[in-house]
Amino acid sequence: SFREQCVPGREITYECLNACAEYAVRQ
């Protein structure tokens, strides 16, 4: 999920960016 993949201090990965995009779309 967004919170699981995009947490402070963790490297920004392609999967993270995808999760962020999906999270934004659902809001």
Swiss-Prot record:
Chief location of this protein within or outside the cell: secreted
This protein's UniProt keywords: Allergen, Secreted
Designated name of the protein: Allergen C-C
Superkingdom of origin: Eukaryota
The organism of origin for this protein: Triticum aestivum (Wheat)
A GO-annotated cellular component: extracellular region
Compartments in which it is found: Secreted
Lineage, uppermost ranks: Eukaryota, Viridiplantae, Streptophyta, Embryophyta, Tracheophyta
Family: Belongs to the protease inhibitor I6 (cereal trypsin/alpha-amylase inhibitor) family.
